[in-house]
C-alpha cells in the first residue's frame, strides 16, 4: 500500500501478509508425521518503508522496517514455516546516488525461545537462529 506524504516522510510503503495453513487429512503413513506439529499454523509479516528524497544533492534514502512472527501453531504442512511464537525484526537504510549507485545497510534480530531444529528426531519449533543476529551491507552500481 502506498502511503501519502506526511510530516514524518515524503513517501512510504506498507506491505503485509498473513499466512495460514491447515493439514486436511493424512491418507498414508500417518505414523511418519512429527507428533509435535499442529493441524493449523498462522504467521504474519509486515514491512514499512518511509522514503526521503533529495536528502543530499542526488541522494534518496529509505528506512525499511520489517517484522515477521509466527502467531499460532507448529506447521505440519509447510517445512520452514517459522518458530512457535518467534520471528524476526529488521531495520535498515537504503539509498541511491543519482540512480546509479545503490547502497543498503541492515540489521536483523531473531527472537523467540531458542533451541535446536530437532531433539530426539522430533521438531522443536524453537528459534534456531536466536544467536544469529546479523548486519548486512551492499553496494551496487549500474552502467
Where are the model-predicted features located?
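Residues that define the transmembrane beta-barrel architecture of outer-membrane proteins
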Residues: 38-44, 83-89, 131-135
